[in-house]
Amino acid sequence: MQFKNALTATAILSASALAANSSTSIPSSCSIGTSATATAQADLDKISGCSTIVGNLTITGDLGSAALASIQEIDGSLTIFNSSSLSSFSADSIKKITGDLNMQELIILTSASFGSLQEVDSINMVTLPAISTFSTDLQNANNIIVSDTTLESVEGFSTLKKVNVFNINNNRYLNSFQSSLESVSDSLQFSSNGDNTTLAFDNLVWANNITLRDVNSISFGSLQTVNASLGFINNTLPSLNLTQLSKVGQSLSIVSNDELSKAAFSNLTTVGGGFIIANNTQLKVIDGFNKVQTVGGAIEFTGNFSTLDLSSLKSVRGGAKFDSSSSNFSCNALKKLQSNGAIQGDSFVCKNGATSTSVKLSSTSTESSKSSATSSASSSGDASNAQANVSASASSSSSSSKKSKGAAPELVPATSFMGVVAAVAVALL
């Protein structure tokens, strides 16, 4: 073979070792060594008689179009990158890639066809500014990353049932996706795609982390548990309906969703870390969290809401801040919650458009914190205002963030206002 990296004796030995580990008997001509690089279609034609190749294959260089014929399995990875003249690629016989499928920096590639591909470890599609179609028959994959492409559809991933990572970001023509995913063991992210992105994950039962940004509509018809963090940030969602969700293991953030007018989490009972709802300008009535009983970190609600129903809340292990610009909002129920010792953190603040209550809580005694509330009102007010300024800055900064910032973080439960502010700041990165 006239691969750019010719097979040396060492490579042949490596190929033999790989072939020995394969479940299929591989002719020596189909073992390409630990890795090999093809720079022309003629290189690929020399392995066209193989049903399986062993080794990591890289395709790069000045190819106008390229195809892998007859090959059904790659026992290794396939990488196609940095080819300024490659306009199309097809490998419609491949059913399995044991390693990764990487497609990167292919500036005029318009189509990529893997019509029979059912199994791969990871797919990474990054910086494909001309691609419009990508086809597979994918059934099993661990990680999917699609970033900075012109894909109008990612339906090639619609039949997947479970993944570790599913990250779709910065694809400006992608406006919809309907998924069959049932579980996500690491992170699910959709961010900075088309202006009116509509998503449906109605088979998803559990996920470790979920972060959605710049989404117009979302459906989670079956979601019951999020093990770590759940975040809805900078979306144009008119409503959120997660009526099957019962537990968020760490942080829950609903921040800077300007069109959001209704949030229904009618079965949610537990938030293990920080719980923040902030800067959702149309969310005037917050009554969809009335079954929440425990918050493992701090809680902060900031906005223009007139109604807040947290009637089942029994325990907040961090501080609490409720700040509404509406003069119709009443702090009475929340002050009763605080006086009963349910707020276990270092501060309690409740404000509306007309009045403000600020109490510095003792970390050692609920009773002493009550008795010191009056004498320390002035100093605690100053401290609370300082914390409010920091928190407001963290919340408002999210409104200008329209880029994907990587996998959703697993946040440590916050134990104070500063903790929840730090948690949200990390979530917004």
UniProtKB/Swiss-Prot annotation:
Lipidated residue numbers (GPI-anchor amidated glycine): G406
Glycosylation site positions: N21, N56, N82, N196, N209, N227, N234, N241, N267, N279, N304, N328, N389
Membrane topology classification: Lipid-anchor; GPI-anchor
One of the protein's GO biological processes: cell wall organization
Keyword Nuclease appears in the UniProt entry: no
Signal peptide location: 1-19
Location (main, coarse): membrane
InterPro entries reported for this sequence: CWI-Assembly_Regulator, Rcpt_L-dom_sf
Keyword field: Cell membrane, Cell wall, Cell wall biogenesis/degradation, Glycoprotein, GPI-anchor, Lipoprotein, Membrane, Phosphoprotein, Secreted, Signal
Function: Required for proper cell wall integrity and for the correct assembly of the mannoprotein outer layer of the cell wall. Important for apical bud growth.
Family of the protein in this entry: Belongs to the SPS2 family.
Protein name as annotated: Cell wall protein ECM33
Species, as recorded: Saccharomyces cerevisiae (strain AWRI1631)
Gene name of the encoded protein: ECM33
